Amino acid sequence: MISSDAIRGYHDLMLLSLLASGDSYGYALAKAIEQRSGGRYTIRESTLYAVCTRLETQGCIAAYQGRETHGRPRIYYTLTKYGRDLLRARRAEWQELKSVVDAFALPPPKRKKKRSDNS
């Protein structure tokens, strides 16, 4: 299981990436995160909605009411143009960050032994 501390900075990337595929609502986003992570990460409901609220305030996503379920309208989220731009930037940042962390997390390549020139 992945710790929430290790993944905290990537909630934006995960949600923006999911919404790039189409509009969705909170419960479906949480299930998609769990499924795409192979069950290795489950986002808490409070975390999910806090991230959605922050992304909406920043203009990255927009919320709208969908059809009613169990007597309440379901709130859907959609990606804005600014959100698409931010997603591109976050993906590029992730690639750069990953290469830096890999330099420390992965074992270093084995060095070839030098032959001494004793001719």
Give residue ranges: language-model regions.
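Beta-hairpin "wing" of winged helix-turn-helix
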Residues: 56-73, 78
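Amphipathic alpha-helical dimerization/coiled-coil segments
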Residues: 85-119
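Conserved catalytic core of Hanks-type protein kinase domains
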Residues: 18, 54-55
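Accessory beta->alpha helical hairpin/"wing" motif in late/C-terminal subdomains of nucleic-acid enzymes
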Residues: 79-83
